[in-house]
Amino acid sequence: MARTLIAFFSRADENYFGRAMRYVKVGNTETVCGIMKDLIDADTFKIEMKDPYSPVYMTCIEEAKKDLRAKARPELVSMPDSIDAYDTVILAYPNYWGTMPMAVFTFLEHYDFNGKTILPLCTNEGSGMGKSERDIKKTCPGAVVKGGLPITGSMAGESRETLKRWLKANRLI
């Protein structure tokens, strides 16, 4: 088993993509994680909500805002039995209202990250990491949270070299 886990939340369907709405079959974050999987030996886990947000972008962002304000912890489709075997967790997600989607909080709060290294990666269209790194540190106080990597979602398919540099800097390549 790999000692690195790539845990990610990604959204397909209608997305804000390079200043326009566009339908995508695979979400930007999942695209980036596929590239990472080609670069390193890692297991992957897709964080999926039991009741997913709307496929319509504008409706989705309103649902996500409502969940954020309510500090909701959406139920997930599944969870890994354990993350004990992993030293490093690459946590990848889109920027939802300046932080992670609430489903990512559900995932993080389910496990003990004490002594683990978390590498945040956030896809976005200009809003960067937001306060997600701070939120991860608060949610996982025993973890070593390294500097995150913001990836422009509309450039997800062209992120290989950026990912390579980041993974090398974090000694995963």
Question: What spans do the regions from the language model cover?
Answer:
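Hydrophobic packing residues within well-ordered alpha-helices of enzyme cores
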Residues: 104-107, 136
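Short, glycine-/small-residue-rich phosphate/pyrophosphate-handling segment
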Residues: 119-158
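N-terminal beta1-alpha1-beta2 submodule of the flavodoxin-like/Rossmannoid cofactor-binding fold
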Residues: 1-88, 98-99, 105, 161-173
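Short, conserved loop/helix-junction motifs that constitute active-site signature segments
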Residues: 83, 109-115, 139-140
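Glycine-rich, N-terminal phosphate-binding loop of Rossmann-like dinucleotide-binding domains
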Residues: 93-94
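Short, conserved acidic/polar surface loops in the N-terminal third of protein domains
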Residues: 101-102, 131
